[in-house]
């Protein structure tokens, strides 16, 4: 490709409304342009990267035995009514009527459509197992789209759905998809971690997320220092204390704490050990009989709302109770709440159950109890794992301790079981002629999100540093004063021809532009390998080569450059 015949569209200035580096660089590198909130057009450079990501995803899915199909983005609402998600999904589901007043949705996901397709097309166990995938546009009407392609309303996704009669083949397909996703991200040259995950709104049993590691990642990953164990912070299991509860050494006493509205203020003002304090959080209960529930964690710990969401007593999704409701029921407000004398159900974290001589709110404004001990001052409450893990704690596999990393979720695989097939009556006849409900798996990759995540992991102050496999161009040719030197023109054109014939994606900057601008553009768009051609190089019989990632420069003799670049591009 010649720059003179290409829409390069680079920008010097960082757009003011772009918050994260991937959004900034995708705009500056001329990859995307905003059409409306959360909606973007791909320019040539961005589309080249997107198509390379898509190609790797497609190749690995095909290798894993999945079959490509394509389903409509527009879906009939009656399928969503059938599964109950018409009401459950919320405002992210964009609903509309056609000219005949029939309800439709713009698909944020395709479980309903694929299940409807399979129940009509598959009738016998002989047709199973089956794994179908598509690469299709999705639309989710996010309340606040942000971070460019990281959280846009319209995005490109690979979603696959598998169908089975038995758990064994479902497990085999799940493992195949796990391996395929690992291969996809490995081929793209990205540092990543597969992690145990919560099944979320889609539901099901087993679930793994695939995270590209990046400091800007929204998700916190807890992983073992001694094994492959890793989990999303929402899913990571807290260790059950092995040490017995300590004996009481303090008397219970009521203390005035007028200026201690938070744990931090309480600890500072009274010189307390934060591990000897607890936080009492009041959430909405699951029934009229238990309208409020108290969840108690240690002062230095954080409530894990995903874990709390699974408690029978707690309404789903977890909702913090309004202060007015708390005051009406307890007589005090947040900052002064605690377990003694509390007339609502209490659930405490495992770590709280072994505490002694601890401090908590007294359920009277501006007062706390110090020296609280279980059994002596109040009965032990229901115990559960309801907190986030912290670094240094032992991991559940016993092979190490927790460490933390930030990640960007780009893939998610689920075992759905019969969540959709049962509600949609997707059945087949087994070997005995008996009707059986299908088991399902679901496997998603955010194709457009991978592009943004790759940038978040690979950039410097000059621009993007693309991994080889997904770079828009592998080699950039920079001819100095090309329009004034026939020698430079001839050699640049010959190299351009040779690289094209070798099947290498190459960008020849044939503009009448200053060298500084040409260098800046090549570095901004992240081309891995750059070759500079000038009269001085020609006199010396060498090309000047620069590696974008390492910054290393080399002089390569004319007759060695093509082989050198072929090897460099292969990695």
Curated annotation (Swiss-Prot):
EC numbers, comma separated: 6.1.1.15
Classification via InterPro entries: aa-tRNA-synt_IIb (IPR002314), aa-tRNA-synth_II (IPR006195), aa-tRNA-synth_II/BPL/LPL (IPR045864), Anticodon-bd (IPR004154), Anticodon-bd_dom_sf (IPR036621), Pro-tRNA-ligase_IIa (IPR002316), Pro-tRNA-synth_IIa_bac-type (IPR004500), Pro-tRNA-Synthase_IIa_type1 (IPR023717)
The organism's place on the tree of life at top rank: Bacteria
A Pfam family per the record: HGTP_anticodon
Keyword Zinc: no
Major place of residence: cytoplasm
GO BP, one annotated term: prolyl-tRNA aminoacylation
Any GO molecular function: aminoacyl-tRNA deacylase activity
Residues annotated as transmembrane: none
Alphabetized Gene3D superfamilies for the sequence: Anticodon-binding domain (3.40.50.800), Bira Bifunctional Protein, Domain 2 (3.30.930.10), YbaK/aminoacyl-tRNA synthetase-associated domain (3.90.960.10)
GO CC annotation: cytosol
Enzymatic reactions: tRNA(Pro) + L-proline + ATP = L-prolyl-tRNA(Pro) + AMP + diphosphate
Stored SUPFAM superfamilies: Class II aaRS ABD-related, Class II aaRS and biotin synthetases, YbaK/ProRS associated domain
Keywords: Aminoacyl-tRNA synthetase, ATP-binding, Cytoplasm, Ligase, Nucleotide-binding, Protein biosynthesis
Cellular location(s): Cytoplasm
The protein's role, per its UniProt record: Catalyzes the attachment of proline to tRNA(Pro) in a two-step reaction: proline is first activated by ATP to form Pro-AMP and then transferred to the acceptor end of tRNA(Pro). As ProRS can inadvertently accommodate and process non-cognate amino acids such as alanine and cysteine, to avoid such errors it has two additional distinct editing activities against alanine. One activity is designated as 'pretransfer' editing and involves the tRNA(Pro)-independent hydrolysis of activated Ala-AMP.
UniProt record similarity statement: Belongs to the class-II aminoacyl-tRNA synthetase family. ProS type 1 subfamily.
Family annotation (PANTHER family): MITOCHONDRIAL RIBOSOME PROTEIN L39/PROLYL-TRNA LIGASE FAMILY MEMBER, PROLINE--TRNA LIGASE
Quaternary structure and partners: Homodimer.
Entry comment, domain topic: Consists of three domains: the N-terminal catalytic domain, the editing domain and the C-terminal anticodon-binding domain.
Annotated protein name in UniProt: Proline--tRNA ligase
């Amino acid at each position: 490709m010649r720059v003179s015949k290409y829409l390069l569209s680079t920008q010097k200035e960082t757009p003011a409304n772009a918050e994260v580096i991937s959004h900034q660089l995708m705009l500056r590198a001329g990859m995307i342009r905003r059409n409306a909130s959360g909606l973007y057009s791909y320019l040539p450079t961005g589309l080249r990267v997107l198509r390379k990501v898509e190609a790797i995803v497609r190749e690995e899915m095909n290798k894993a035995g999945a079959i490509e199909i394509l389903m409509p983005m527009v879906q009939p609402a009656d399928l969503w009514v059938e599964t109950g998600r018409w009401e459950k999904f919320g405002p992210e589901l964009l609903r509309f009527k056609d000219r005949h007043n029939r309800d439709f949705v713009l698909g944020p996901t395709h479980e309903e459509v694929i299940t409807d397709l399979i129940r009509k097309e598959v009738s016998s166990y002989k047709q199973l197992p089956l794994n179908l995938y598509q690469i299709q546009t999705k639309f989710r009407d996010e309340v606040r789209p942000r971070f460019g392609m990281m959280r846009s309303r319209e995005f490109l996704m690979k979603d696959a759905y598998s169908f089975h009669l038995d758990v064994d083949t479902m497990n085999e397909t799940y493992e195949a998809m796990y391996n395929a996703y690992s291969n996809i991200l490995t081929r793209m040259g990205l540092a990543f971690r597969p992690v145990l995950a919560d099944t979320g709104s889609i539901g099901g049993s087993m679930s793994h997320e695939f995270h590209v590691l990046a400091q800007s990642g929204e998700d916190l990953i807890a992983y073992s220092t001694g094994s492959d164990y890793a989990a999303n912070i929402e899913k990571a299991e807290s260790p059950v204390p092995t040490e017995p509860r300590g004996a009481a050494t303090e008397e219970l006493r009521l203390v005035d704490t007028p200026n201690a509205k938070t744990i931090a203020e309480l600890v500072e003002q009274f010189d307390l050990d934060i591990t000897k304090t607890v936080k009492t959080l009041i959430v909405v209960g699951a029934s009229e009989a238990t309208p409020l529930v108290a969840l108690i964690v240690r002062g230095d710990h954080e409530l894990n709302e995903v874990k709390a969401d699974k408690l029978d007593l707690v309404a789903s999704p977890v909702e913090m109770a309004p202060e007015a409701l708390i005051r009406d029921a307890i007589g005090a407000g947040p900052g002064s709440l605690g377990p003694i004398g509390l007339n609502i159900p209490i659930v405490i974290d495992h770590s709280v159950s072994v505490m002694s001589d601890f401090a908590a709110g007294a359920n009277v404004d501006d007062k706390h109890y110090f020296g609280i001990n279980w059994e002596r001052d109040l009965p032990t409450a229901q115990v559960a794992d309801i907190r986030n893990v912290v670094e240094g704690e032992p991991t559940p596999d016993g092979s190490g301790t927790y460490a933390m990393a930030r990640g960007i979720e780009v893939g998610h695989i689920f075992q759905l079981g019969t969540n959709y097939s049962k509600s949609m009556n997707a059945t087949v006849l087994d070997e005995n002629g008996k009707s059986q409900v299908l088991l399902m798996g679901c496997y998603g990759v955010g194709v457009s999100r991978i592009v943004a995540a790759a940038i978040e992991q690979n950039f410097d102050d000059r621009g993007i540093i693309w991994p080889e496999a997904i770079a828009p161009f592998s080699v950039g040719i920079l001819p100095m004063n090309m329009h004034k030197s026939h020698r430079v023109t001839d050699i640049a054109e010959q190299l351009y021809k040779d690289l094209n014939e070798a099947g290498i994606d190459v960008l020849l900057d044939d503009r009448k532009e200053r060298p500084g601008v040409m260098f800046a553009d090549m570095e901004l768009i992240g081309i891995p390998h750059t070759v500079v051609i000038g009269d001085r190089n020609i006199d010396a019989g060498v090309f000047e080569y620069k590696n974008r990632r390492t910054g290393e420069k080399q002089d390569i003799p004319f007759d060695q450059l093509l082989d050198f670049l072929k090897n460099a591009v292969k990695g």
